[in-house]
Amino acid sequence: LRVLSDPSEEVILCDLRLLTQICSRADEHHFRLFLTDLLERFAADRRLLESWGSLIIRQLCVHLQTERVFPVLADILETYEDLEFASIMVQNLNMILVASQELKPLRRRIRALDTREHQQLFVRLYRCWSHNAISALCLCLLTQSYEHAYNVLRIFADLDVSLSMLLQVDKLVQLIESPIFTSLRLQLLEPEQHPFLVKCLYGMLMLLPQSSAFATLRNRLQAVHGLGHLTMPNDERPHTRYARQATPDVPWNELLQHFRTVQLRHERLRLATERLTDNEPRRRVQQREPAPFARMSFTANAGTRSARE
C-alpha cells in the first residue's frame, strides 16, 4: 500500500493491478482488511486521497467489481471513529458513484430498487452516506427517492448549516444540470406525479444564498412553474406513483432516524472543534501575559524590599 503514494501514475496503476490480483483470490475477511488498510492510508495521507483517491477507487471497481467494493467500503465507513474523515471520504465516494463511467452498472441497480438485493445495497450505501448530509441527499435524488429526499431536507432545519454544506449544495445543483440527472429534469415535466421532487428542489433553493447556483436552480423551477397552466385529458394522464416512498421493503423511517442521529453526532463534533479553535488564541494570550495576581504579588514584594532598605 505504501507504493500508492508514489508520484508516478504508471507505478500506481501497476501496483493496483498487483493488489487487485491478490484481492481477487482473497476471502471476504481479508478483502475487508485490505479496504480498511486503504482507508487508513487515505486518512493518514490526505494528499494521496485528493490526488489519486478517485483513480484508486475506480480501478478497484474495474478489477474487483463495483458491487463488491462499494458495499464493503460503506460498511467500514459507517462505523468509522474519525467522523471528519468519514464525511470527506463519503463525499469522494459519492462523486465517484454519480459521475464515473465505471460505476454506471451500480447506478442502474440502485436506481431500480426492484429486487431485494438492490434494496439492501441501497440501504448499506445510505447508512454510510449519512456521514455527509448533501451526499445522502444526492443519493436519494439519484435513486428517485424524492419523498425521502424531501424528508432529509427538512432535517436540515435542525442542523447548523455550515459554509461547507452550502458549497456542496452548490455542486449538487451543478450535478443536477449534468447528463447524469437527465431523467430527473424530465420528470419535472410531470410535477403532479412527482410533487416531492419539486418540493425538494425548492427546499434546496431556500438553502442557497444569492449565487449563480441559486439563479440556475430558480430558472429551472420557473420553467416548471409555467407547466402549471397546462392540462392533460384524463385518459392520457400518466398513472405513476409517487416514486420511492411506496417501496415497502426499504425501511425509510429507520433510515431517516439513522440520518438524523449521525448528523447530530457530526454537529456535536463541529461545535466542539469550534470551541477549541476559539479558545486557542485566548490560551496563547494568557501564556504571554502574566496573570494580574502575579503582577500584584511582584509589585507588593518590590514595595516590601524598598521599605526594608
Protein language model features and the residues they cover:
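Eukaryotic scaffolding regions of large macromolecular assemblies
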Residues: 8, 19-22, 27, 32-309
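Tandem repeat protein-protein interaction scaffolds
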Residues: 2-10, 14, 21
